[in-house]
Amino acid sequence: MIEEIARVCMSSSLIPSVNKLGSLPVQIAGSEELKQKYLTRLAKGEGGFSYCLSEPEAGSDAANQKTRAVRDGDDWVLNGVKRWITNAGVSEYYTVIAVTDPEQRTRGMSAFVVEKSDEGVSFGAPEKKLGIKGSPTCEVYLDNVRIPGDRIIGAEGEGFEIAMKTLDHTRITIAAQAVGVAQGALDYALGYAKEREQFGRPIADNQGLQFLLADMGMKVEAARQLTYAAAGRSERGDKDLTFFGASAKCFASDVAMQVTTDAVQVLGGYGYTRDYPVERMMRDAKITQIYEGTNQIQRVVMSRALLK
């Protein structure tokens, strides 16, 4: 589904994908009470989920969390700032990673469900982005946000592990987005090449362009097959999921950036204008190389998985 939506509009594909990202920690490690409460509401369309991991000083270095959660009786009190949060201000629920024991680094983080209506939750202005402009991205501010103790996801200290397990699965969603936007750009480029005439014949008759289109199609299908292979491992919970999730995301997003750029080239000057959709596809594709871990970080993840 993500692939097919992204084939037309990547911003729209973020609606289901971010809800998967935000709710998956509850599915993976939440108590039965949390699952019944929040996943039921999500399934009924009563509120969406966002995922709050990134911070101003914790991008690729996700372990460098500054948001704190402190016990106060039976409650937790959260303070901090989360950055680059998709659907911030729109979603009703937020999976928040916060430090509960600063001495333990990654083993001192925990995951919580924070509700939009909780006192002390506020949001920044929408970011002015290169692409995916139809999807809001904002900061989330937590100012003495008090939540009941039963909103912790999993056990105290398991937050970082839960966050990383979540990304193993959801990076495949990003790969699917990348395949979709690449396929959409290829579709448009093919149609244009058959209709656009220069030198008295369709530009698709030019062998140089044929080779470009062939490479685009080959790369898209290779990315699709790797993404589907990774998706199968996600469903089965295979041991090599970490490698396949990272490799699918990395390869498919690199393909998406190349194919959408090539699609602009096929359309020439027209591709550079907003009268045609490929310039938007090219701008949208860029984020797939960045979010849920840059492709440089994906290569670190893959190498560690191989050398383990």
Description of each model-found segment:
Residues 1-13, 29-34, 45, 61, ...:
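Alpha-helical interface subdomain recognition
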Residues 2-6, 98, 114-119, 143-146:
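Short Ser/Thr-interspersed hydrophobic loop/turn segments at strand-loop and sheet-helix junctions
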Residues 20-29:
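Helix-loop "lid/cap" segments that line or gate small-molecule binding pockets
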Residues 45-53:
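A short, Trp-centered hydrophobic/proline-enriched beta-strand micro-motif
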Residues 50, 66-68, 75, 93-97, ...:
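Conserved hydrophobic/aromatic beta-strand scaffold that supports enzyme active sites
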Residues 57-60, 84-87, 101-103, 129-136:
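Short Gly/Pro-enriched turn/cap motifs at secondary-structure boundaries
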Residues 64, 117-148:
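Flexible, small-/acidic-enriched active-site or ligand-binding loops
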Residues 79-123:
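A short core secondary-structure module
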